[in-house]
């Protein structure tokens, strides 16, 4: 799929799990950036349905989610004429390379995965698929010769693992894979869920993009806040403030901050 050194233009790669309905974390964490990148870059974007197997074991649900994710992504602005867009599981070489990479990856590299430890702490069932998740992600990245992988700060370690695997493979078999670089925007913010943790379907704390008015309203009204009195300053580090800020420009964020710190406002007014 990729021949070392042939590509001149920098290739950007990103993917999204079809774990359920798309939410604000998907859009502000990755999708909005991809829609912007497709205008001037060699963008590769895929629906990573194999990764979703760590949380979904119902074939019909996964199939439905995969199709819906592709439809929703296009509805939000991804243009297949400007982007290489595909379903991860449709390329068997991904699994083949994952097995090859597994045999040159030291256990210690995976043992240090903070993402795995965090997911287990949040209640996800530990299994080999979840543990070896970074190797499958490395296949996604290396197989397509990605130079740049936009990620949040919490995903940077996965790119570092992919680099380590590429370096070891190249050392054993000769120069084959590009060494990918993570791209973390300086203003990139972790999108909080309604409970204050990272918004994730795994944590059941999401706000859907295409949900009904009733569902979206219920989720917003459930956003975690403290018990500050109406005349007390409100917490600008709260998930409510951070979520609201995603929809605002800097001057509007400053105005919202003033409202939070001034007396007379209730959290319910913002919701």
Language model features with spans:
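Short, Lys/Arg-enriched N-terminal segments with co-localized hydrophobic residues
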Residues: 1-7
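Short, polar/flexible loop-turn hinges at active-site or ligand-entry regions and domain interfaces
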Residues: 59, 148-152, 176
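Internal, conserved structured core segments that host functional sites
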Residues: 118-169
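Short helix-capping/linker segments at secondary-structure and domain boundaries
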Residues: 107-111, 143-150, 248-256
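N-terminal Rossmann-like or analogous alpha/beta NTP/dinucleotide-binding catalytic cores
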Residues: 10-139
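Conserved nucleotide- and phosphate/pyrophosphate-binding catalytic cores
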Residues: 26, 157, 163-271
